[in-house]
């Protein structure tokens, strides 16, 4: 069930956040309003992936700009503005097929994480090169991967391959 996966991922993120010094600890905002989610969908021009909707309904944004290179996940209003400005690609291609996508997160370096509308797979867009690469097969998988980054950051692991 999608909701349980998102809830599990949020618990994992909160646990990982607890490993960090208080000054670097990520913040978890309250739920986005129905109007904010509707405005995001209007900007995207599609129904957003169910898992991302569940995330926004539970936690509008996760802000961790002091963790490694910075993570900003969600934020319905900010994402709607970004989509309206055309900040990031609206289509993701795996080499053989292209599919509509939307931004769901950014890092501290100006890159974005895009979710394909149809399947929720998450891709990293490098704003300097224009290259888009797969990161996770699902939004909850992406959130679990971010949690792993945070665990390794808390352990001062310089060998870990961070996604940001």
Description of each model-found segment:
Residues 121-127:
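Intrinsically disordered, low-complexity regulatory segments enriched in Ser/Thr/Pro
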Residues 22, 152-156:
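Intrinsically disordered or highly flexible coil/loop and linker segments, enriched in small
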Residues 93-97, 128, 132-135:
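Short capping loops/turns at secondary-structure boundaries
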Residues 1-113, 160-164:
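A surface-exposed partner-binding patch
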Residues 130-153:
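Compact, glycine/acidic-enriched structural inserts
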Residues 114, 124, 133-134:
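A sequence-level detector of short linear motifs
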Residues 116-119:
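Short acidic-glycine loop/turn motifs at beta-strand connectors
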């Amino acid at each position: 069930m999608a909701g349980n996966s998102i809830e599990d991922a949020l618990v994992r993120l909160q646990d990982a956040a607890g490993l960090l010094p208080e000054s670097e600890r990520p913040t978890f905002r309250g739920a986005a309003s129905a109007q904010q989610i509707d405005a995001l969908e209007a900007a995207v021009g599609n129904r957003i992936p169910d898992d991302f909707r569940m995330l926004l309904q539970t936690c509008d944004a996760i802000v961790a700009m002091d963790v490694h290179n910075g993570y900003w996940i969600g934020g319905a209003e900010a994402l709607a503005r970004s989509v309206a400005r055309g900040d990031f690609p609206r289509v993701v291609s795996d080499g053989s097929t292209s599919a509509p996508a939307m931004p769901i997160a950014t890092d501290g370096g100006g890159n974005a994480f895009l979710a394909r509308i149809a399947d929720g797979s998450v891709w990293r867009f490098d704003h300097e090169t224009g290259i888009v690469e797969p990161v996770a097969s699902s939004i909850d998988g992406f959130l679990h991967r971010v949690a792993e980054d945070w665990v390794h950051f808390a352990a001062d692991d310089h060998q870990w391959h961070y996604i940001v």
